Amino acid sequence: MDGLNILTDPVWSERVSPVSFVGPRRHRPPGIRFSDLPRIDTVLVSHNHYDHMDVATLRRLAAAHHPPLFAGLGNTAFLEKHGVPGSRDLDWWESVPLAPGVTLTAVPARHFSSRTPFDRDRTLWCGWVVTGPSGSVYFAGDTGWGSHFQMIRERFPNLRLALLPIGAYRPRWFMSQAHINPEEAIRAQETLGAETAVAIHFGTFDQADDGELEPVEELKAALAHHPDPKHRFLALDNGESLDLPLLPGERLPSEALAKEGQG
C-alpha cells in the first residue's frame, strides 16, 4: 500500500499452539513462501492469541527484514522477552506515521486476549486502519459484533478495503461475543461503508465447529440472498491476490518516484 509492504498477524508455523507438536495444524500452506516475501516494511499484530501472534514467525521476520511491529497496549514487553525486537504498543485511536503521508491507527475490536489460563485480558486487542494517498484500509483482526464498526466509519468514512473475519463462529452461544459470522461480516462491511471487503480468518486452522469450508459457503449463500451492487465481498483462493483500481490522479509508487527523478 502506497509503496509499503505490510503484514497482518503473520503465521508461517505449522501449528498455532503453545507447543509445536500438538494443537491446531494448518490445512493449507501459506499463500506465499517465506523465502518469496518482498521487503517487509511493517508488521501489525491484532492480539496475542497463538493464531495471530506467532512468535516463531515474528522472530524470522525480525531477522530477515527488521520491520517495525505494532500491537495493542501491553504486548511489547512480552515480545521483547521472547526475542522479537522493534515493537511498539498503541492504544485504541492512537495514530503513528508509517511513512510520509501514510498513517497507522489502532481501532477498537470486541475480543479478548490470553496466552495462558492466567493472563486473560492483560494486553489490549485491536484492529488497524492504514491511511495514505491511495485511501484507507481496515484490518479487523478478530472481533465480535459491536458499535465499534460505526465508530470506525465515523472516523474513516471512505474505507476502500475492509479485511473482515468470517470463521471460528460456531457454536454461536459461545463464539458470538468474540467472532462475527459470515452474515455479520456482510453487515460490518455495510456499516463501515467499505467499497470492497475481503474475507480472512477461515480455512487454514480448525478452531471452531464451522470447520474449514463452511465459512465461505455461508458467506456466498448470504451474499446471494442480499446482493449489493455498490459493494463487493470476496473470499480469495489461497495465494490469490487482489489489485484495487487507482484513484483519480493516483500514481503507482514507481511512477511517482520516476516523476520525482525527472523533476
Regions found by a protein language model. Name each.
Residues 43-51, 199-203:
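Histidine-centered catalytic micro-motifs
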Residues 254, 259:
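Short Gly/Ser/Thr- and charged-rich N-terminal loops/segments
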Residues 1-4, 98-160, 176-184:
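Catalytic core of the metallo-beta-lactamase
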Residues 26-28, 68-70, 74-77, 136, ...:
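Cap/insert and terminal regions of metallo-dependent hydrolase folds
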Residues 4-48, 56-60, 74, 114-120, ...:
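Pre-active-site segment of Zn-dependent metallo-hydrolases
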Residues 10-12, 48, 74, 109-111, ...:
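Active-site metal-binding loops of divalent metal-dependent hydrolases
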Residues 1-36, 71-141, 160-167, 218-240, 244-246, ...:
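Metallo-beta-lactamase
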